């Protein structure tokens, strides 16, 4: 379908269409231009069919719209000389449509999906870094942004729309990408945004409380994640056997690679496996000895904490499953860099060690604090808040975790959005046994500054919740703010 025309694009579903050339594909009538294909989907907030007249006025070449029902699937109408094709269950078909439009980019690179509550960003970054060290031209897609390694452009969502995903992949292929590592969110799976992608491998990191404002309960959240393996072309399956959900899934995925730090591996049951034999944590990171069905080895890592060792082992197992030689992986492992805003360490002589992390769920906060404790000779500080207009149930849980695992807790704002900041803080304090010992400071800049200035040089200050983000949402305003930049400025170093 070299010239991208309407007849060839819809050939698997609809016959009798004109071979009208199409310039670009868009879901947004505001940016639709002459020669484009406008796709009018029925979304959660708006019905795209209402904007068909606007798209026609802007000169689009053709329109695909959601059909009223199964009976009208494939119906073709003409409005002001523009063909309008109606398809039933358009959202479910959108990934396949966009895949055809952009010439199936996922088939022209090695694309790895990474899903799970925590660890997606670090694991995708490690996969991209490591594969590039082995000669690939690697790209990432996810929370931090999309692009070739080192040229990432920030994005709004972990997983973009079905059209965005295929468009970005096509752009990456055009730039020469041969390997891609992509974060896949539960929203993205439920909303069919990656439905037609051909993954070479799919990685599951872990599952813990998050997004229950969207999914309702943990059962539905787990079901959303499981879709990657049950309804998608998942390729090689790599699963964290230390996670209870992961162990359950491994029973249904007999060909999966089981990965463990805690001994949850039975070589007689798991044909392919990788497990940590010994891990030594030190001020520079960790030394990891491992065994696997591919052979044994040792890695010096600059990453902090046990959960990052798990992320590293998942990345290693994935690349082994894809056929990269163990000897080459071991030779290049020491060159892997820490990930921006993910247990990122800032140090300066005579100042406390500051760690900036994206932890914004109960499980992630606990793991971040446990990781920081491994590298802390003095007091462990925790500065954090919770996002407004999001799952309120996790707030007291995170308060309890901070109180249990940190020596000094500073509760502040995260992204309060349209909620009253003090109300969010009170929800956090409600989970604590002795809230009177907690330091409360609403302004995040002031809270971070106060903690770093008061901490001693052998203390560790964990600033949790925002990680790589360079903004704060207050009300409906997006304000410039970065934990990384604030910490670096106070320590007199460069972020």
Curated annotation (Swiss-Prot):
Catalyzes the addition of meso-diaminopimelic acid to the nucleotide precursor UDP-N-acetylmuramoyl-L-alanyl-D-glutamate (UMAG) in the biosynthesis of bacterial cell-wall peptidoglycan. A motif (Meso-diaminopimelate recognition motif) lies at residues 414-417. It is found in: Cytoplasm. This is UDP-N-acetylmuramoyl-L-alanyl-D-glutamate--2,6-diaminopimelate ligase. Belongs to the MurCDEF family. MurE subfamily. InterPro entries: Mur-like_cat_sf (IPR036565), Mur_ligase_C (IPR004101), Mur_ligase_C_dom_sf (IPR036615), Mur_ligase_cen (IPR013221), Mur_ligase_N (IPR000713), MurE/MurF_N (IPR035911), UDP-N-AcMur-Glu-dNH2Pim_ligase (IPR005761). UDP-N-acetyl-alpha-D-muramoyl-L-alanyl-D-glutamate binds at residues 27, 29, 44-46, 157-159, 185, 191, 193. Meso-2,6-diaminopimelate binds at residues 390, 414-417, 465, 469. ATP binds at residues 116-122. PANTHER family: MUR LIGASE FAMILY MEMBER, UDP-N-ACETYLMURAMOYL-L-ALANYL-D-GLUTAMATE--2,6-DIAMINOPIMELATE LIGASE MURE HOMOLOG, CHLOROPLASTIC. One of its GO terms (molecular function) is ATP binding. Carboxylation is probably crucial for Mg(2+) binding and, consequently, for the gamma-phosphate positioning of ATP. It holds the Pfam family Mur_ligase_C. Its EC number is 6.3.2.13. GO terms for cellular component: cytoplasm. Its cofactor is Mg(2+). The keyword Cell division applies. It catalyses: UDP-N-acetyl-alpha-D-muramoyl-L-alanyl-D-glutamate + meso-2,6-diaminopimelate + ATP = UDP-N-acetyl-alpha-D-muramoyl-L-alanyl-gamma-D-glutamyl-meso-2,6-diaminopimelate + ADP + phosphate + H(+). The gene is murE.
């Amino acid at each position: 379908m070299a010239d991208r025309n309407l007849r060839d694009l819809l050939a698997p579903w609809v016959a009798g269409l004109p071979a009208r050339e199409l310039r670009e594909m868009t879901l947004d009538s505001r940016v639709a231009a002459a020669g484009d294909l406008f796709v009018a989907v029925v979304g959660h907030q708006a019905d795209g069919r209402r904007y068909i007249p606007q798209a026609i006025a802007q000169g689009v070449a053709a329109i695909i719209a959601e059909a009223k029902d199964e009976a009208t699937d494939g119906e073709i109408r003409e409005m002001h000389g523009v063909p309008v094709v109606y398809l039933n269950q358009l959202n479910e078909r959108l990934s396949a449509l966009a895949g055809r439009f952009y010439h199936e980019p996922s088939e022209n690179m090695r694309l790895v999906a990474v899903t799970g509550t925590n660890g997606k960003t670090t694991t995708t970054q490690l996969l991209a870094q490591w594969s590039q060290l082995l000669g690939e031209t690697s790209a990432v897609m996810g929370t931090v942004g999309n692009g070739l390694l080192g040229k990432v452009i920030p994005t709004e969502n972990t997983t973009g729309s079905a059209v965005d995903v295929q468009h970005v992949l096509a752009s990456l292929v055009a730039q020469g990408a041969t390997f891609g590592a992509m974060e896949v969110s539960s929203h993205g799976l439920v909303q069919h945004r990656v439905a037609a992608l051909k993954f070479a491998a799919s990685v599951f990191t872990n599952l813990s409380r998050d997004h229950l404002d969207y999914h309702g309960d943990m059962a539905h959240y787990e079901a959303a994640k499981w879709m990657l393996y049950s309804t998608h072309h998942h390729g090689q399956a790599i699963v964290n056997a230390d996670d209870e959900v992961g162990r359950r899934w491994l029973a249904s995925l007999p060909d999966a690679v089981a990965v463990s730090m805690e001994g949850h591996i039975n070589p007689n049951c798991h044909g392919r496996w990788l497990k940590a034999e010994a891990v030594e944590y030190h001020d520079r990171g960790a030394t990891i000895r491992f065994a696997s069905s591919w052979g044994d080895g040792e890695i010096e890592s600059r990453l902090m904490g046990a959960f990052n060792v798990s992320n590293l082992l998942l990345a290693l197992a994935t690349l082994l499953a894809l056929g990269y030689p163990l000897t080459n992986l071991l030779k290049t492992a020491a060159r892997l860099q820490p990930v921006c805003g993910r247990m990122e360490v800032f140090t300066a002589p005579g100042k406390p060690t500051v760690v900036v992390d994206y932890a914004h769920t109960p499980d992630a906060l606990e793991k971040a604090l446990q990781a920081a404790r491994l590298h802390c000779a003095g007091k462990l500080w925790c500065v954090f808040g919770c996002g407004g207009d999001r799952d309120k149930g996790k707030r007291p849980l995170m308060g309890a975790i901070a109180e249990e695992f940190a020596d000094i807790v500073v509760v502040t704002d995260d992204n309060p959005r349209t909620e009253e900041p003090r109300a969010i803080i009170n929800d956090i304090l409600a989970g604590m046994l002795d809230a009177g010992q907690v330091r409360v400071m609403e302004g995040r800049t002031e809270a971070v500054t106060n903690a770093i200035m008061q901490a001693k040089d052998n203390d560790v200050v964990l600033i949790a919740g925002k990680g790589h983000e360079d903004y704060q949402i207050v009300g409906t305003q997006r304000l410039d703010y970065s934990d990384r930049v604030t910490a670096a400025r106070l320590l007199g170093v460069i972020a």
